[in-house]
Amino acid sequence: LGTPQLARILHPFVGVVMFASFIIMFFRYWHHNLINRDDIFWAKNIRKIVVNEEVGDTGRYNFGQKCVFWAAIIFLVLLLVSGVIIWRPYFAPAFSIPVIRFALMLHSFAAVALIVVIMVHIYAALWVKGTITAMVEGWVTSSWAKKHHPRWYREVRQKQEKSSE
């Protein structure tokens, strides 16, 4: 179906589309992913979380989910910047060989790191029952929300009660 040459040609363009998609997500969700005191409490109690105990008054996203968000954004920015530097024949001639070599190493590191983040994200989603539905279909049951994200559950319920008045 495809050739290595075609993959090499398409790779940078697919990367730009991927980056643009994540930037849209960034502007949509950044304010939900700001780290607060409750997140620090969550992180300090990671051992309890690993054995499926709920800790803290978690909002829409827990500390782990926020870390995935920020890591994805940071690694995608690194991929974009390094990718532009190594993008032949368009931009690479503007940079020295040492800069291109550094960009290649940075690009490889950021790609592997992002893949690891995505794998951890998928594993965690499989680990916590009901999370795959949230990721794939975009909704969760009220009992799931109440158990895993109690502050967010209360906020949504308050909005529903106000809108029904």
Regions found by a protein language model. Give the residues of each.
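Membrane-embedded alpha-helical bundles that constitute the cytochrome b-like, heme-associated redox core
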Residues: 1-165
